[in-house]
Structure formats: structure tokens, C-alpha cells
Amino acid sequence: MFRDFINKLNDRDSSDLVFNPYKDKRVANDLKIYLEYILKNQNNFVLLIGEAPGYAGCKITGIPFTSGDTINNSRLSVFTGIKNKLFLNTIEAEKTATIVWDYLENKKKLPVFWNSFPFHPHDIGDQLSNRAPSNDEIEEGKFYIKKLIE
């Protein structure tokens, strides 16, 4: 269902300032599994858009606002329902992911998470850093937001 969207993400090359986690087909598939689960299990959607993937969360999992630690330790059905299908080569804890999903633990409705720029912006040559996306990167990100909504 999300194949075309995932393929568009995969088309974007990494650079000295941006890492594309969706070049890894396993990470791209994890995003697809997450989106399909949300679509299948909810009938109304709220899209919550963050800034960009962090190096310890979405850069590794492919799922916005989500770290491997969140996936492994959450009792939310979204994760208990999919975690055995996901590829996690590294388990990291990420502060924002922990705060967001802990808050949602007792909520009946979950948002669909996305980022204004879906790739990991980092300092030059340092993929273990986070930086805010540039205006041009946010403009680029609008394309992917529109594709996701379609």
C-alpha cells in the first residue's frame, strides 16, 4: 500500500550533511509495517509532524519519534503487534521517543508520526550528531508530506 511512498524515500541520496535511512530496505520495510498497522487499526487519523529524525531514533528504526528501546519496551499495541516483524540492528534509547510514547501509553488514539524533513540531518561528517533541517530541506520535506497524505 505504501510501496510508491517508500520508493520515493529510497530515491533520495545521502550526502555529507544528510543520511537517508530508507536506503536500507529493511529500515524502509519497518516504516511500511508501522504505517500499515496504523492504517489497519485506526479509522481516523491525526498526523503529527516533528522536525527530523534523530541519530538514536528514527535514523535507526525508520519510524518517526521511535527508538529501538521504545519498540522493545512499549506495551502499546502498535509495537506489540509489529515488533516481531521489524528489523532492529541497533537498540538505542532516545529521549524524545521515550517521552512521546510514554505519554501516549494510556491514550486510545495514536497519531501517525512523520517529520518535516524525513532524513537525518547531521553536522558535516558526523552522523552521530543532530542538526535542525535547513529551510531548503524543509521545503524538500513538503513533497514527502504530500505523498504520505495521498
Give the positions of each predicted feature.
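A polyanion-binding, active-site-adjacent surface
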Residues: 1-150
